[in-house]
Amino acid sequence: MSKTNNKTDSKTANTNNEAKIALHGVTKTFGSSNRVLQGVDLEVKKGKSLVIIGGSGTGKSVTLKCVLGLIHPDSGSIKIDGQETVGISANERDALMRKFGMLFQGAALFDSLKVWENVAFGLIQGRGMNRKEAYDIAMEKIEAVGLRPEVGHQLPAELSGGMQKRVGLARAIAANPEIIFFDEPTTGLDPIMADVINNLIVKCVKNLGATALSITHDMASVRKIADEVAMIYEGKIIWHGAVKDLDHSGNPYVDQFIHGRAEGPITKNEPTPLKKAS
């Protein structure tokens, strides 16, 4: 009996540790010489939230777009649930996208649509759901992100930036996705509203049992929403570990970045000073 239980426990543990998203040797070059990704290796475990950090131009956004299928990598493998996604057909890509939810850097709302219609957009247009059913789901999600029901009948222009971000989050979770992507989710928000959004992200991801992949410069957001953190530098993942180990990474690049220090191995090109008029 004990032997059987051990096997069951082992199987359960393996299932929980399965990679929901797996990138191996992913490269991408733009033009003839701008090699942005130089062999990205990264795994996101099922049900975990991983945040990619790194400076501007290091490859964060390109990595995210490759996973989403918005950019085609030059080489390497990108698997979702063990299925290779590089080079799949349009129909296979459409089926895969049904697993995804996305909160964009800007809320990316349609100005001419009411809030509930924005939240329900993917349900109606992407899944062919009737408007009544989509409306009910949209209103449920609007309340789930802390907005009053009447907000659902307003236009995006009538909302503050923080409220628009909540609407974007409601849209991201409308179809109960298996994987949610967050692109700089707190950009443009004051510290208090940023923390509100971070708390909502944690709650929504947990309630859905979803896997999350995010990119951000906001270290307060990283510490709040991440289970694991990966740092990308010059197109490669140079550190990957638990968020609790971030301050003790032993990596000078990570240490410099998370503390925002000018001095360190990461160098920034300073602008050439303007010459004084003679």
Task: Go through the PLM ranges and name each one.
Residues 113-121:
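Short coil-to-helix segment of the ABC ATPase nucleotide-binding domain corresponding to the Q-loop/switch region
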Residues 176:
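Conserved catalytic motifs of ABC-family nucleotide-binding domains
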Residues 83-84, 132-150:
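Conserved ABC ATPase "signature" region
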Residues 180-183:
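Catalytic Walker B motif of ABC-type/P-loop ATPase nucleotide-binding domains
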Residues 68:
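Helix-to-loop junction immediately C-terminal to a conserved catalytic motif
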Residues 155-159, 163:
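Conserved ABC ATPase signature
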